[in-house]
Amino acid sequence: MPRHATQQVHAGYEPAAPHRPVVPPIHQTTAFRFPDHATAASMFRLETPGFTYSRTGNPTVAVFENRLAALEGGIGAIATATGQAAVALSLLALLQGDKHLVAYSQLYGGTVDLLTDTFADFGIEVTFADPADLSLIHI
């Protein structure tokens, strides 16, 4: 297994032809060109791997995600643009279906909005509680 320092520099990226840059290039684009309509349709239906629109992924972000997964010994990683997006994705993955979440009563306002407004749309009930109040704990 490669050393940690080696993984930090090389994991998740293989230089590609024609130029074979040692450092991953930064792809500053929002959209990608397709060789034909059929390929584009297949990629948008998620039947063929590839990049369609940078909000859902691009080669630069893919290198970062692959490198992070390798460094953490994981099978994959998801990069988000904000902490709020990371919180939402994590909780929604855990709270699929009609679930109930007990949350700390003193959260960031944006998180409170997420939990009370957005999560209600997904059928997730949220109760806010002060964890220092032991009378709220029922076994």
Where are the language model's segments positioned?
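A glycine-rich helix N-cap at a beta->alpha junction
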Residues: 118, 122-129
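Alpha-helix C-terminal capping segments
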Residues: 70-71, 89-97
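Conserved small/polar residues in nucleotide/adenosyl-binding loops
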Residues: 137-139
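Short acidic loop-to-helix transition motifs that present clustered carboxylates
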Residues: 84-87, 130-135
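Conserved PLP-anchoring active-site segment centered on the Schiff-base-forming lysine
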Residues: 93-111, 130
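N-terminal glycine-rich, Lys/His-bearing helix-loop that initiates the first secondary-structure elements
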Residues: 1-48
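Conserved N-terminal alpha-helix of the aminotransferase class I/II PLP-enzyme fold
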Residues: 31, 36-85, 110-117
